[in-house]
Amino acid sequence: MVILALNCGSSSVKYQLFDWEKKEVVAKGMVERVIIGDSFIMHEVPGRETYRKEYECPDHKVAIDLIIRTLVDGEHGVLKDINEISAVGHRVVHGGEMFTRSVLIDEKVLDAVKDVQHLAPLHNPPNIAGIEAAQAVLPSVPHVAIFDTAFHQTMPEHAYLYPLPYEWYEKYGVRRYGFHGTSHLFVSKRAAVLLGKKPSDCNIITMHIGNGVSHCAIRGGVSIDTSMGLTPLEGAVMGTRCGDIDPAIPAFMMQKENLSAKEIDSILNKKSGVLGVTGRFTDRRDVIENANNGDHRCKVALEIEAYRLKKYIGTYMAVLGRLDAVVFTAGVGEMGWPIREKTIEGLEGIGIKLDRERNKSAMTRKRETLITTDDSPIKVFVIPTDEELVFTEDVVAILDGTYTDHMNFDYSFARQDFVRS
């Protein structure tokens, strides 16, 4: 069984082809600059040089068609025929309250995803476009939706409701939903393995730190709180998003700068966070380099980010009552050792003892690493995430009828004998 996993953004399509019988990734890549022009595909096959080709993709259908043609290409492909693809798994950012698990996509499901796209206007429309495009290119295979929000549907009411007029929740669904669910699921299961415990016996804080950043408090394998909210704007400091701020600031600045609601929303989502403070950078490597060279705004940006991360550890530790481990994952979480160090240092009093040398050596996207001392009561791990593997396993389980939900399903990566492909 060969599964194609697709992750469609507003101007990109990421893909991964997984051979389930061999338990290995046979190809992966990305089409970038979809719609906006000068688009190209980067195609990777293990053991070969990365293949790049410029090809104009005015929409997602053309991009997905390009991916399929590349996968079956005589020189660069890995398939002899398009019919070797057994099913397609699609990342869908927002599933509202309706979807608590991954589901087979039919007309009713697609309509429901469209009904909640107002809750994620930057994310769901390209997800929907990708589903429709893939169905057009691969009409005879099953398509499955895997929702970012599903993992967090276990949050209690007191965690997901905002102290706002209750009618807003009833009429418009205004509540905390949370995102990056598949990433939090994967790394929390792996952390339980590294702890030598069952997920049901673990209390874990997972920290997904990339351009987007979210944290999750996980008790007994279940999400009980998360930092992102109604939208991915809430929570920690991010590459271009502000995260938690005084909610009066937008109205204040709209008056001062004569900004529209659309303009202030764009600023908070695209011109704030690390970019807003530094004025130049979203890539933390650039921020770290310039901070080390004396750039005050870059130094402050790092301090703000690490300070907010530290606060979330304390907050979620209080919520959980007992903590077994903290996990760093995603691009910055996996590679940004200075940010991890700034976040963890000073937490010895609550049982987290950083091993600085281990932390500095944990700079790989392949290895799971303990970065606290052996005698640290609370462990801190760096665990590379693998959302596409979650997509793949959900698809396979739905097709063979063994899938229940993310809490009870026996994922391969939750086993002691799991080996990364």
Curated annotation (Swiss-Prot):
It comes from the Bacteria. It is an enzyme of class 2 (transferase). One of its GO terms (molecular function) is magnesium ion binding. Keywords: ATP-binding, Cytoplasm, Kinase, Magnesium, Metal-binding, Nucleotide-binding, Transferase. Its cofactor is Mg(2+); Mn(2+). Belongs to the acetokinase family. This is Acetate kinase. It comes from Geobacter metallireducens (strain ATCC 53774 / DSM 7210 / GS-15).
